[in-house]
């Protein structure tokens, strides 16, 4: 018989996934978590109000800064995990990003078991709250979410990491430390500059014959002009970053919102509707 797969060393493989959490002020929460496959240590975690790449980064970036860079990260095909941003971040740090085959959850048993533990030992103690509950307690949504993350971190560090795991016979923290002692070195931590570079949002554009680049309906003038050259746009930095040194000047900004931002609804016209005659005597209202 073949036993279940397990990474031989710490930071050989991280497994990531998202879990639906409690309602905070009538808003749904999601837990992003990353588990070291060898030790079962929770290397990164964060509750957020959306299941997107922004909240994914909030869990992954501190994990890399504190626990080091893994050789591989194994995730499913959720929208946040297949985003090009995650692929770019992993490539910048030399991490192999692996997605499970659709409908085949093999290799995800450890993170799923951890989520069962979260439900049975942590979430059972957390009560859903409404907006009225937060108002009565004098807390806003941000403060309530921070408190949820604080409580979860305390549970992970004082309970989960120190309890003996039934499969390994060691606590996750003990197995993590023992693994590095056996390897004879500590985790390789990325520099702050490398992390910042890896987690930039990036878009590529080609310079037009008029020496401009366009991004989200905004036009930027390139100086010096390089028609046909490829430029990469990165955020949070507010500059265009080409493969060669130059600057880009914003010359036309008809749009002030990102494409994912919700557009305001149009107010109804207060003027009364008037009938408009069409052919064959029909009347429509506008």
Can you name each region flagged by the protein language model?
Residues 61-78, 243-244, 274-282:
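Short, solvent-exposed cationic patches
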Residues 17, 40, 60, 73-76, ...:
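Mobile genetic element proteins and their domesticated derivatives, centered on retroelements
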Residues 73-93, 97-123, 129-137, 146-148:
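RNase H-like two-metal-ion nuclease catalytic core shared by retroviral integrases
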Residues 208, 212-215, 219-286:
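Protein C-terminal end segments and domain termini
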Residues 48-52, 260:
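A short acidic/small-residue loop/turn micro-motif
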Residues 121-220:
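Active-site-proximal acidic segments at structured loop/helix or strand boundaries
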Residues 40-45, 98-100:
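Short small-residue beta-strand/loop micro-motif enriched in glycine and branched aliphatics
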Residues 1-35, 41, 53-62, 66-71, ...:
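Mobile-element integrase/transposase regions
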């Amino acid at each position: 018989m073949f036993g279940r797969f397990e990474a031989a060393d710490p930071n050989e493989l991280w497994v990531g996934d998202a879990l639906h959490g409690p309602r905070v002020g009538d808003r749904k929460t999601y837990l992003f978590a990353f588990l070291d496959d060898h030790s079962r240590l929770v290397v990164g975690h964060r509750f957020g109000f959306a299941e997107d790449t922004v909240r994914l980064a909030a869990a992954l970036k501190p994990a890399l800064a504190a626990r080091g860079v893994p050789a591989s990260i194994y995730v499913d095909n959720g929208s946040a995990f297949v985003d090009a941003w995650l692929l770019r971040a992993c490539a910048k740090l030399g991490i192999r990003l692996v997605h499970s085959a659709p409908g085949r959850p093999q290799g995800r048993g450890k993170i799923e078991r951890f989520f069962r533990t979260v439900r049975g030992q942590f979430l059972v103690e957390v009560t859903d709250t409404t907006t009225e509950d937060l108002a009565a307690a004098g807390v806003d949504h941000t403060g309530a979410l921070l408190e949820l993350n604080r409580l979860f971190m305390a549970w992970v560090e004082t309970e989960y990491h120190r309890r003996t795991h039934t499969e390994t016979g060691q606590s996750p923290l003990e197995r993590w430390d023992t693994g590095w002692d056996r390897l004879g070195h500590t985790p390789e931590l990325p520099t702050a500059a490398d992390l910042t570079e890896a987690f930039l949002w990036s878009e590529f554009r080609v310079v037009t014959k008029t020496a401009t680049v366009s991004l989200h309906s905004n036009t930027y003038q390139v100086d010096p002009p390089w028609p046909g050259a490829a430029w990469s746009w990165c955020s949070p930095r507010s500059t265009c970053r080409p493969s060669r040194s130059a600057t880009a000047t914003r010359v036309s900004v008809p749009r002030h919102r990102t494409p994912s931002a919700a557009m305001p609804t149009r107010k109804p016209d207060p003027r009364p509707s008037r009938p408009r005659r069409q052919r064959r005597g029909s009347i429509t209202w506008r």
